[in-house]
């Protein structure tokens, strides 16, 4: 070309035109016309020396196009059928493996009978996986001769990928999924079965077989199921509104969650019939079908994943400016040939090299650099090998080499900054038709969460050409070998760690222990690599460390954050996670901990209360002792997951601890389960069992335990055991629609307890009143001997006129008793000069009354005196008035 240009300056215009056309024809003759699309893409980048290699490559192993790329979602089944008839002919051997490797990824399984590739990816399998399908034929000497090959990709999306997209990807009928999909802001009702299994220990075939067995048991299609491992020991969902037990007595493995969708925004009344899950899970039929113990099940409403807000982290980045100095010329490097060693096929991972930024306070005139192009040719092997880069010593900065995603095998150069010691300006490097713009080496001022970098698609046995920009100074050239690993190279400054994935938000509940393991991909450092190699520190605002008494604690050795909030911590709390590398530089991630109130509230079916020896202040003021108490209580119940215990209260009176068990369903009353848990920890009289005491000692010594019902079981007492009450037999109950179970239990209490007690009390009261009246009445008609004697002594008998016998009149007590032989007395002597008393008229009247009687009735009976009294007469002064006078006795008649 230089000769042509030189001659064109000397020849006339017609000669110049002829030479120009001749040059164009010669240049076109160097490029063959290939129908392949890959050759058409590379015809502006490959030199003539590469055409023979490329032609041999296409003739040796033709690439078959026809296997489309696939996508998979974490926790959902993946299945693709490989069209082997397009790849292999009769007698060929099909080999499926990861591109450049001998085996498939750990989550994929190849079924040679059905020619299907299936598997179930986990969270650690996110990213792009390239699968190579090759056909080989057995040669005469026993070696395998490659025939055809094809490479396709499978991209694994995270679990919180769009539900509609993930289900549509796995479902054979997209129309069915669209019809049953929920609205964008509508929660999805999910039924989850908790299995005592470890997915990381299963082979891909065992995971798929587990889904097939659940499909035959529950009649739910595979594309609707999701199988993920338990994270942070959270076996149970605190937001579940229905739950039930399984047949597993205790959890041994890490645990697996197998779930499927029931509907949209369902509640307890609108949930479809789940008897096919509830009874088999409890009785063991589901465990026998699946081959793994069933811990329990629950139903909860899952809100659709909302886009996370983007946090920005500001770094102290310099501003690139031009440097002052004379123009320099980049020296052209002669082409060098790098021959890789004949090793096993391997795919080079994408690498990224960050060059140091350029800062100069004085702007100047930009220098002129000449862009050169060095040809690095790679010998074709079974798998593309990343070539090592050769650069000049001194202050030469190697160019950044990164494969693009669309042009196979082409390594895209990026702009490289010059260190401050040189006098050149950062060159502007251009690439021919790049599919993706190159990344500048300077650090940007904002950072966004990035996904796993998508690796380029490998193409079997294709050579690559690398375009490298060289910047040199006057130092003598010396060959050095550079790598792109994470180990710091000599002379490069330490770079601060970068925040890759935000922690963003942590949810916790009052009284429930939580723990969060910081993922290893949260931060990344170019020298120290992943997060587990960095030193993490949890701080509050203004660089204040979290105290020992804080309800949130962080273990920097295991990089585990844990805590136990109480009711005073309800709300949103902001914390900062600092990651520091060995050089002392750090990065910060701000995240929030949202503390929610107890989802069950006061509706827990049972409350467990235990009394321990000790001072309650020692437990209340020490978060570590509270956490240890919760862990020991969970261990006493046989649960490895501490989130099954919700601490309600710690009060005085030694140490009185009240808690609830989150594994118990709210409705209906789980009487048998509560009784089983009660018998596990306490005797019938409330004394703790030895197993419970051994689980909590020596830190906590229990003295008594009480288990009382609450919520749907509030009318029951479990510990201490109450003697059973005799309940009369009843007829089979009639189903009454829309009857409240709580109201029914209240009616039973009134019917069997309150009403009989009131009736018995009323009967006893009436009987007492009747007995008292009868006693008073009987006592009123009887007198004692003393009362009778007093009556006789003090009283004078009164004889009424009607009571006298006229035939035989009683003798008069006023007349003297005269016998029959008795003679009349002598008349009284008369004395002379006797004065007549004033009462003479009375005596005279009296004598006059008696005298005629004696004269007229001489036959009158003699006088009979009354019988003598047994007691002396007392109190004769009280004689009643208006007494009927006695009739006078008959007159006395002398014989």
Curated annotation (Swiss-Prot):
Modified residues (Phosphotyrosine): 892
Compositionally biased region (Polar residues): 832-846
Region described as Required for binding DMD and UTRN: 880-895
Signal peptide: 1-29
UniProt key word Membrane: yes
Disulfide bonds: 182-264, 669-713
Region described as Required for interaction with CAV3: 819-895
Residue numbers spanned by region Mucin-like domain: 316-485
Post-translational modification: Autolytic cleavage produces the alpha and beta subunits. In cutaneous cells, as well as in certain pathological conditions, shedding of beta-dystroglycan can occur releasing a peptide of about 30 kDa.
Protein name, as recorded: Dystroglycan 1
Upper lineage: Eukaryota, Metazoa, Chordata, Craniata, Vertebrata
